[in-house]
A protein has these predicted regions:
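Short amphipathic alpha-helix with an adjacent loop that forms part of the alpha/beta core around
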Residues: 78-84, 134-137
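A generic structural signal for well-ordered alpha-helical segments enriched in polar/charged residues
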Residues: 113, 174-177
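Core AdoMet radical
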Residues: 43-53, 62-74, 86-101, 112-130, ...
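Residues that form or flank phosphate/diphosphate-binding pockets in enzymes
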Residues: 34-35, 102, 131-132
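Generic structural signal for well-ordered alpha-helices
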Residues: 105-108, 134, 169-173
Length: 192
């Protein structure tokens, strides 16, 4: 439950303050000041990355992201008791590949219905088409980022350990039909 996250955060802060926890030692963002109670903080960011399911195995990636680990807990259960979020809530979807989750469409719809995020971004390889994602793009309630990493199938296969560049490009064309400004395409350059 979300209350467990708050308790863990309290413990971490207490440990930092009394010197028994050094996980944040040396961090430039660590500041000494009077802070509001954690319970009074607004939740402004949710990053959905509780799995490592992926339909590719990119040469620059690690098995942390493509290792095939199913979600270890229910996000719907986690957010069950959470009703208040900040007005500037942003949701980021990653993983692994978010769209290969069996529950992606339902989870995407339920989190959007419950929280009405101000912005959200789905980091997808676009190898699998999602009607729910298409509808969110068409209604301008999400954006996507896709790393293509190649211009031809041979290079795509070498970098991604997967065929499907044409399929990815077709899906990106469909996704961008109504709101091309919400689609970011990037390339990651490697020495290979």
């Amino acid at each position: 439950e979300y209350s467990e996250i708050i308790e863990a955060k309290k413990k971490l802060i207490e440990g930092i303050n009394n010197g028994t926890d050094d996980r944040c030692a040396g961090c430039f963002a660590l500041k000494e000041r009077d802070w509001d109670n954690i319970e009074d903080e607004e939740l402004n960011s949710i990053s959905v990355e509780n799995h490592s399911l992926c339909n590719m195995k990119c040469s620059y990636c690690s098995d942390v992201y493509y290792g095939g680990v199913e979600p270890q807990y229910s996000l719907e259960h986690l957010f069950e008791g959470l009703n208040d979020v900040g007005d500037d809530l942003h949701i980021a979807w990653g993983g692994g590949e978010p769209t290969v989750r069996k529950d992606f469409n339902d989870l995407f719809l339920s989190l959007n219905e419950k929280f009405h995020p101000k912005t959200q971004r789905v980091f997808t390889n676009a190898l699998k088409y999602s009607r729910v994602l298409q509808e969110a793009l068409d209604s301008r309630s999400t954006s996507i980022t896709t790393s293509i990493d190649a211009g031809v199938e041979d290079t795509f296969r070498k970098v991604r350990d997967s065929k499907g560049l044409d399929k990815v490009l077709q899906f990106l064309e469909r996704y961008s039909q109504n709101s091309p400004d919400l689609i970011t395409i990037k390339y990651i350059f490697t020495v290979d």
